C-alpha cells in the first residue's frame, strides 16, 4: 500500500507516529489486531514492523556488516540471523561486496540498499519505506522499486510513502491520499491512477 500527499501533508509524521517517535493526541494504532501506540519503539520493531526512514539514517561510522547486524538487535537465534544476512546479500549484491566498508563512504544508492537490508534483518511482517527514491538517479530508483516488488512478493507487506505518485501507485495494491493529516481518499491503486483528482494533484494531469 502507499500513502500520497503534498509536502507537509503529514506523511512522514504518520510514519513516525506508527513507530512511537511521535505520540498521537487521540485514537489508536493497531498492528495485526493489537494496539501498539503505547509501546516503545524497540518493542514495536519486535512486534513485526520495520522502518526505512527518509534520508536512510544508516550508522555512517560503522561497517556495512555492523549496520546489518543492528537490524537484528532484538533477535537471539544467530543461525537465523546468519541466514537472513545471506538472504539480504543475495537481494543486494552490492552490499555483499562491501560488508567491511564503512557505511558512510558508500554512495547514496548503496546506502539506500543498506537501509532496506537492515530493515529486513528484523524479519518484519511489514516494512515502512519513507521516500526511498529521494536523491537517487533514475537507474537507482528503478533498482530500489524492483527490490520493493521482490520484498512484497516474498510475503512482506510494504507501506510506501513516495513523492513519485505514479511509481508508488503502480507498485501498490491500495492507496491512501493524505491532506493536512487526514485521509481524504482511499481506493485500489488501479482506481486511484485513473481518479481525476489524483491525476490533477499528483500525476501532473496526465
Language-model segment annotations:
Residues 1-206:
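Glycine-rich phosphate-binding loops of nucleotide-dependent enzymes
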